[in-house]
Amino acid sequence: RALKTREDIFDIYVQPIPWGKTSWLWKDDDERRNIDFLLAKTIAHIDSGGKFDVSLQVTIPNEWEKLAPINIGITAGIESDKVSAKWLESCNMMSKVLTISEHSVKSFTDTIYDAINNQTGEKFKYCLQSPIEYISYPALKHEPVNLDLDLTTDFNFVTVAQMGPRKNFEMTVKAFVESFKDDESVGLIIKTNIGKNSLIDRENCKNSLKVLSRSLGDRKCKIYLLHGALTEAEMGGLYTNKKVKALVSTTHGEGFGLPLFEAAYYGLPVLATDWSGHLDFLCKKVKQKNNKTKIKPMFGKISYKLAEIPEHAIWENILIKESKWAYPELSSVKNNMLKVFKDHGRFKKRAKELQNWVCKEFAEDKIYDKYVKAMLDVIPDDLMSSSPTWLNEIEDIIKEYE
């Protein structure tokens, strides 16, 4: 999207890559049709022996390659406080690294390994050497689409979290049930999946929730499972539903935290772990009279302790054993949920203030301009002054006809 704002200087090609077990999403709109056109264009270009001047590789760093003279790695970074040596090695192959939050930058720049030069035997400190900066995601507000959620409760929390160790959604459920087990007017909507949006995945989610719910004892409060792919407009409908009062996240860590960001720019109060990438947009920067900038938290801060990630969460070359992430405190989660329930007006007023700031600070054109500038910073002037490949090809065809 950022590149398309400057098609006068960028000749764009696209090559899709798989991501785990995630399904390929499809929708019939202008953007998808353009992507399909670019895919076909890329295949034809490669088949004809075409080369590329610059590669932008949007994936985890250990999958980055030297595909062009100039290579820019784009990653959401890591959710813990330290990256793997493999990631540093991949980053140092890149002309530049772009990530998405101050937390992610810090995880890269703070990671240092003891290494040995194989040729000299000399010990040295191995760290990030390529330039790195972060550019946030843009606020992409859509006209909300009404969702028929069939809610029987008037006050509902929502959590958007894939089932897995890092999102820690079990703590969200536990805190909710222990806080509202005797109140039949309160509900928790869980927007989740395990890996896909299939019927089998839905059944597996239902079974997991049933087991978790039974372990927490009898309750009057309601738990709703929301499963399947929703459009951006439908997610907007979820965040703006009159019966949905706050989003809660007990995450161990986020590179950015897109659902929290979406909730913020739709004006929904957010309760979240007070650590990692989402602090970039949940804390408003306020200029004081002395021209100094003050960081003002605009969300329900869930207290935490920083400790090493558990054994079952280790992911080779990604989430490493010696790294740490946040462990939210159950009492703080419950306290925040009860506060927003009892004093929702105050939280909603603050959320509206945050919404106004986020929509201005993270506006699409502002974010896209930052991406374009970041790329131009590493592209030599002589390359930018030359005509794009597609223009040269068109000129050759015209000459043949002449």
Give the predicted meaning of each segment:
Residues 21-109, 234:
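Extended catalytic core of nucleotide-activated donor transferases of GT-like folds
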Residues 199-240, 245-246, 294:
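Nucleotide-activated donor-binding/catalytic signature segment of Leloir-type glycosyltransferases, i.e.
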Residues 252:
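Aromatic "clamp/platform" in nucleotide-sugar-dependent glycosyltransferases that forms part
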Residues 269-272, 283, 289-301:
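Short hydrophobic beta-strand element within catalytic cores of glycosyltransferases
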Residues 243-245, 267-269, 274:
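A short alpha->beta transition loop at the rim of the catalytic pocket in nucleotide-sugar-dependent
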Residues 95-144:
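Donor nucleotide-sugar binding/catalytic pocket of nucleotide-sugar-dependent glycosyltransferases
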